[in-house]
Amino acid sequence: MSSVAKSTANKLDWTKIVSKLGLSGQTAAALTSFKKRNDEAKRILFELKQQPSNVDFAFYKSTLKNTAIVDKIQSDVSKFTPSKANLSKQLNLIESFEAKALENAKETESVVLAELTDLEKTLENIESARPFDQLTVDDVVKARPDVEEKVQDMVSKGRFEVPGYKEKFGDLVIM
């Protein structure tokens, strides 16, 4: 990891990411899971760095009768070189996570923008609407042409009562 990436990773404030970006659902859960794994890896690395790595072979040679085995272990330790781990699989997982997170973020952005546009139109309609008591039948028919069709259909069939009206508002007939 480059020094710039390490510096950025250390400065990253995980608590603000979800709230500032407005993430929710699967994206927020995946980010939280990634943060937990990152914190656990940092903790384990810190603990391992704190452990002493030097072995006092002179102490073991003076304590044990079989110094040949201590010499063998000492030579094996001096020859030991840590193996390089293949991180390509983990890096590919991180890249796929980033790609999926970016895709989810773009989807969320498009949904939010569409919703905002609809809400702005609705607000504009509400602000420009006339008061209810100033509406005419022609205004209602212009806004909802299906209302005129329903009324004409009911009149042609001889129905002059709106279905469900009595159940909802009661019957005002006294006799």
UniProtKB/Swiss-Prot annotation:
Lineage start: Eukaryota, Fungi, Dikarya, Ascomycota, Saccharomycotina
Protein name as annotated: ATP synthase subunit d, mitochondrial
Function statement: Mitochondrial membrane ATP synthase (F(1)F(0) ATP synthase or Complex V) produces ATP from ADP in the presence of a proton gradient across the membrane which is generated by electron transport complexes of the respiratory chain. F-type ATP synthases consist of two structural domains, F(1) - containing the extramembraneous catalytic core, and F(0) - containing the membrane proton channel, linked together by a central stalk and a peripheral stalk.
Modified residues (N-acetylserine): S2
Pfam hit, one: Mt_ATP-synt_D
Highest rank taxon of the organism: Eukaryota
Keyword Cell inner membrane tagged: no
Claim: Membrane is one of the keywords in the record: yes
Protein family (similarity comment): Belongs to the ATPase d subunit family.
Organism of origin: Pichia angusta
Keywords per UniProt: Acetylation, ATP synthesis, CF(0), Hydrogen ion transport, Ion transport, Membrane, Mitochondrion, Mitochondrion inner membrane, Transport
Example of a GO cellular component annotation carried by this entry: mitochondrial inner membrane
Biological process annotations from GO: proton motive force-driven ATP synthesis
Localization of this protein: Mitochondrion inner membrane
Subunit annotation: F-type ATP synthases have 2 components, the catalytic core F(1) and the membrane-embedded component F(0), linked together by a central stalk and a peripheral stalk. The central stalk, also called rotor shaft, is often seen as part of F(1). The peripheral stalk is seen as part of F(0). F(0) contains the membrane channel next to the rotor. F-type ATP synthases form dimers but each monomer functions independently in ATP generation.
Membrane topology annotation: Peripheral membrane protein
GO molecular function, a single term: proton transmembrane transporter activity
